[in-house]
Design a protein with these regions (language model features):
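Conserved catalytic-core segment of nucleotide-activated headgroup transferases in glycan assembly
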Residues: 163-275, 281-286
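Extended catalytic core of nucleotide-activated donor transferases of GT-like folds
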Residues: 4-31, 36-157, 161-166, 260-265, ...
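Short, polar loop motifs at secondary-structure junctions
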Residues: 108-113, 159-162, 239-245, 309-313
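P-loop/Walker A phosphate-binding loop and immediately adjacent motor/lid segment at beta-alpha junctions
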Residues: 116-129, 171-190, 302-304
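Residues that mark the start of a beta-strand
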Residues: 1-3, 123, 198-200
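Catalytic binding pocket for nucleotide-activated donors in carbohydrate/polymer assembly enzymes
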Residues: 7-10, 15-18, 22, 29-44, ...
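Hydrophobic anchor at the start of a short beta-strand
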Residues: 33-36, 124, 199, 233-235, ...
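C-terminal alpha-helical cap of glycosyltransferases
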Residues: 360-401, 406-411, 415-416
Length: 416
């Protein structure tokens, strides 16, 4: 199968974002598919060297090439700048690939355009990595946004509960199918013991996108800010948030860009960690979306236990060893104690969970099979539309943030 894949590697040229697209490309190729990467967001790239948006795409172009070329994909990409100019492969090359493509996959808004070459591909799948936020934005009924999603033949989401009675998020006429971020586990496995005796995370304190429909991680994190007082200084965060506030409460911090500047640096930070302690965005939690982090999957694949906030994902994944859920500060402290009491067992279980649930071959075989079927992504019955959600008129409960910050996780302000 020939697959045109749209991602956001240059738009957000940072380690964690890069791995998301890269593992789709590598996973699909390992299944025997021919892949081509395109990026066509209509927006300026973020340039970490200048710490700002840039009209000059040079940094992003070099970054894409450095990310893809080591894996044999150096001649299989095209970047469309905000001004419509093509870099890497030409528009003619993209159109030629698309003419014989079987499937178009758009991850996280790798393009917001329906150019003829994209629209002509028989199967067109969108991968929603921001569940609840995406559906709540669609529910605002902005014409261009609704029409954009109607252009796909299949819609997938990292929110395992979206469109089910477990979550009140309105889905309207759209049908969303559950999927996970694929992980090429062989690229994350390590036999080396962790160099840090701390649980870590790479996190965004706040983001600017979707501020009118949801709440961010700062709201949730404040509920757990006293955790080090119970467990001791066990945590290290890569965050560009309120570092003084965090440090005063026992959280060690490192510059987010130091960790996220490259895919290699991001992976090294995860592999060197004892495990992950992860808090979710408020909207993921409040809507019981079932969202599960691509970053957490990488910790697990590295054999690093993960202690992460429950968003409803516990209905779909194991949560007793290697991967532990919490909803309260007491549960978080207990989870730390449990992992510390038998670290080797939890580390083995972490790897097993990654292999069983997130291995790229497994995830992508299922996705491609479903995307190749006739199917439909428009609901035609009240039960499918989840009228319970529409009638509930879901609104996000927000509290004032105590501090503003730039993004971390290597994502500049405006990251979805």
């Amino acid at each position: 199968m020939r697959i045109l894949f749209a991602g956001i590697i240059a738009r957000y040229p940072l380690g964690g974002v890069t791995w998301c697209s890269l593992m789709y490309l590598l996973g699909l190729r390992s299944l025997g598919h021919e892949v081509f990467y395109v990026e066509d967001t209509g927006e300026c790239i973020y340039d970490p060297e200048q710490n700002t948006r840039s009209l000059d795409p040079a940094y992003g172009l070099a970054y894409i090439d450095h990310a893809l070329r080591p894996y044999g994909l150096g001649d299989s990409w095209s970047f469309v700048n905000y001004d419509g100019t093509y870099h890497g492969r030409s528009r003619e090359d993209v159109a030629a690939f698309a003419r014989s493509a079987d499937l178009f996959i758009n991850l996280s808004g790798g393009t917001w355009f329906w150019r003829d070459e994209y629209a002509s591909i028989p199967r067109r799948a969108f991968i929603d990595s921001d569940p609840a936020f995406t559906q709540l934005s669609i529910a605002k009924n902005e014409d261009w946004y609704v029409k954009f999603f109607r252009g796909f033949t299949h819609l997938f989401t990292f929110g395992a509960n979206i469109g089910t009675p477990a979550s009140p998020v309105p889905t309207g006429d759209f049908v969303w199918h559950k999927t996970w971020q694929p992980v090429v586990t062989s690229l994350w496995h390590t036999d080396a013991p962790p160099r840090r005796d701390r649980y870590t995370s790479v996190m965004s304190w706040t983001i600017e996108s979707f501020t009118d429909v949801g709440g961010n991680k700062d709201i949730e994190f404040l509920r757990f800010i006293d955790l080090p007082a119970r467990t001791g200084p066990r945590f290290e965060l890569a965050v560009n948030g309120p570092e003084r506030l965090l440090q005063e409460n026992g959280w060690a911090t490192v510059p987010a860009m130091q960790v996220s500047r490259t895919p290699g640096g991001y992976r090294d930070f995860i592999q060197s960690s004892r495990g992950e302690f992860g808090v979710a965005k408020h909207t993921y939690v409040a809507t019981r979306s079932g969202w599960f982090s691509d970053r957490t999957e990488c910790y697990l694949a590295a054999g690093r236990p993960a202690i992460v906030q429950d968003t409803g994902w516990t209905s779909h994944l194991p949560s007793d060893a290697g991967l532990l859920a919490f909803s309260s500060i007491d549960e978080a402290a207990d989870a730390i104690e449990r992992v510390d009491a038998d670290y080797a067992r939890h580390a083995r279980a972490a790897s097993d969970i990654a292999d069983a649930h997130f291995e790229a071959g497994r995830v992508l075989s299922s996705l491609v099979e479903r995307a190749s079927m006739g199917g439909r992504h428009f609901a035609d019955s009240a039960s499918e539309r989840g009228e319970r959600a529409a009638e509930g008129q879901w609104t996000v409960q927000r509290t004032p943030a105590t501090a503003a910050s730039e993004e971390s996780e290597g994502k500049p302000s405006g990251m979805r």
